[in-house]
Amino acid sequence: IKHVKGNGKRRLALFTDPNCQYCKKLEKEMVGLTNATIYIFVLPILPGSEEKAKAIWCSPDRLKTWEDWMLNGVEPQSEKACDTTALTKISMHTKKLRINVTPTLIFEDGVIKPGTLTLDLLEEHLTEAGQTN
């Protein structure tokens, strides 16, 4: 799921679980980010997360459905089945990257930060990562 804010100049990858409370806290912090592109990789590792991930993935507007759930608690509805092999691929790639905690952030410079960050720390890391590229 790709979320462009402002000019989208700074980039960030987010590995996140739809049932993770720390992920939801991070999402609330990220609302204030400016001029960033966030690549959201849904990684269902907690109980009940796989069905939610599929419902979000199969929705007509993934980003809206994701934000409705993560920020507002609106349960994603599974309207129809769709190809969810991307979710399987995300899971396989995270194993290769040894990502087993959500949330996990990867910045443009390759720095990996597991856990929740404040908006100030997110901005700081995004700025630093952009300067090294």
Which residues does each PLM region occupy?
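Short coil/turn linker and secondary-structure boundary residues
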Residues: D61, C82-T85, L117
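Substrate-binding clefts and substrate-entry loops adjacent to catalytic sites
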Residues: V74
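Post-signal/leader-peptide non-cytosolic segments of secretory proteins
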Residues: T104, L119-D120
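A short, hydrophobic beta-strand/beta-hairpin element that forms part of a small beta-sheet core
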Residues: T94, V101-P114
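Acidic, Ser/Thr-rich peripheral helices and adjacent loops at domain boundaries
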Residues: K52-M70
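Extracytoplasmic thiol/disulfide redox context detector
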Residues: I1-E51, D68-L71, E79-V101, L122-N133
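Short active-site-adjacent structural elements
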Residues: P114-G115, L122
